[in-house]
Amino acid sequence: MAVGLFWNERVSFEKHEWAKRFFFLGNNTGNLVFIRALKDIFHPVMIPLWDVTSDTFRDRADITHYITTELIWLTPNQTYPHVWTMLKRIGDKPLVPISVGVQSMARNVDITLHPDTVKLLRTMAERAVLGVRGEYTAAALGGDGL
């Protein structure tokens, strides 16, 4: 059994000295620490996010679940067609969204998500638990029945 993680490795840290590693971390603390934690917990098969061909992972019968972090920044009227593409490519296997987060500068829980985004989240919720970031996101998504 294996887990697939949709992610593009952008930097190989091992080739840089410590000062440069801290520089990278400071520019993207949350995502870098977050991805490292997912790697340590699941030891996933890394799947290129933007350059995925069907033969990259469709035939991986050992992958039972897929993980995405692409929904950490949900904004009004935004759609996520690349996440739909992930769902299409993995068939009926679960795509687990880690740290789903609604973003509103006014912190308004009555935020209006694009209908396609609501449909996407409902489709994902049929296969996996939606891991949301905090009470604000839970309340905002609850307004859409999620």
Model-derived features: where do they sit?
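Aromatic- and Gly/Pro-rich donor/ligand-binding loops
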Residues: 1-129, 135-146
